[in-house]
């Protein structure tokens, strides 16, 4: 999505020294959240991302990247590494891995959103949800979306969270594409349309090193 937007450049980063000063950092999905978070921690990538966040850079987490942003990851059944692991601590939530994998189509609507996603408030979307485990919020966070149905079964659940300034954002389903487009547009406006640079950690970066 980002790569198709004029004025936006995307760079895939495998080393902390390559991170630089981007306008946005995207943590993508992964098939092994705990193992890849351990790689980020050992390589210095986590520290570099946290430093950028402290300086005001928005962080966007998708799927496994979403799970990394919380306080703790717990894997009592050994689905991934087993045991527990400290998260990046950017969002007050815990993730619990389970053996059951969720795969479903979803329809929903954005709630009232602040910051770089404010233009999406009230917009409808459709997409998919695929993940293992559940992420549970421990604090007063802004919800991004309301899911009206899973495979046409209404249950009105909520998905995606953001901190108070929408500087740390997490999304677990098909609303991701609209989020990416809106973030690019708003960050470019904030930078007087001078262009935007995004750093994205590639999926499975640990294994490809």
PLM region descriptions:
Residues 10-11, 15, 105-171, 175, ...:
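C-terminal and late-domain segments of enzyme folds
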Residues 20-22, 27:
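Terminal amphipathic helices with adjacent charged low-complexity linkers/tails
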Residues 25, 88, 130:
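Hydrophobic, well-ordered secondary-structure elements that form the walls
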